[in-house]
């Protein structure tokens, strides 16, 4: 179920402060965050945000096509190593 329009998009306060600070100063630096549930807003376009995937921070460059999506969508948490060649059950 989608979030109510009355509430507006969710974004962590600390992340919003950091983005606003970078926008006013004009600096370009990587913002580290653990907030995968934060929605990407138009003010974030052009910034690089390092999103935590449970093990490390993956840098994500924000483009205008990403607006409205969540940060966690662009930092995968699981890596598939592949099935072993002799595993008969996985090959069925």
Curated annotation (Swiss-Prot):
A single MF term (Gene Ontology): structural constituent of ribosome
UniProt xrefs under SUPFAM superfamilies: Ribosomal protein S19
Main location (coarse class): plastid
Biological process per Gene Ontology, one example term: ribosomal small subunit assembly
Annotated compartments: Plastid, Cyanelle
Signal sequence range: none
Cellular component terms (Gene Ontology): cyanelle; mitochondrial small ribosomal subunit
Pfam families in UniProt: Ribosomal_S19
Keywords of the record: Cyanelle, Plastid, Ribonucleoprotein, Ribosomal protein, RNA-binding, rRNA-binding
Family, as annotated: Belongs to the universal ribosomal protein uS19 family.
HAMAP family: Ribosomal_uS19
Function comment: Protein S19 forms a complex with S13 that binds strongly to the 16S ribosomal RNA.
Name the record gives this protein: Small ribosomal subunit protein uS19c
This protein's encoding gene: rps19
């Amino acid at each position: 179920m989608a979030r109510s329009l009355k509430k507006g998009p969710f974004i962590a306060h600390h992340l919003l402060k950091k983005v606003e600070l970078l926008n006013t100063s004009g600096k370009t630096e990587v913002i580290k965050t653990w907030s995968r549930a934060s929605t990407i807003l138009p003010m974030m376009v052009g910034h690089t945000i390092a999103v935590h995937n449970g093990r490390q921070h993956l840098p994500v460059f924000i483009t205008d096509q990403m607006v409205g999506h969540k940060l966690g969508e662009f930092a995968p948490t699981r890596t598939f190593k592949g099935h072993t060649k002799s595993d008969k059950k996985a090959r069925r």
